[in-house]
């Protein structure tokens, strides 16, 4: 899967309606959010085998064990090229403290809570904790 030439426009269109959407396991959690971003940029859903398979935290763990590679990082390693988090670029997938988001250079965007507001949150790069990153490749 490769980014489309207009991937930035596609990503912005994907993010806009999600800004205030609350977290929901299996529908709008960190995995489905990051996968939706990849699909917006590339036109390919990287996790079709997970869609509709879980609706709880426990269910997500079961899905990772049954159709994934056992855990989130290993599942992503099998689907994307891992890169050092210090080299993550805009549009790449980043994990910080087990939370997946989309890199926007100096920060990542993820599903979460900021005070009383639920929806998309910003996590500055300096605050990334034990980060991992995966490249969403550019087109051929």
What are these regions (language model features)?
Residues 1-69:
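N-terminal capping segments
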Residues 125-140:
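Glycine- and charge-enriched low-complexity intrinsically disordered segments
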Residues 57-123:
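...with weaker cross-activation on analogous glycine-rich loops/strands in unrelated enzymes
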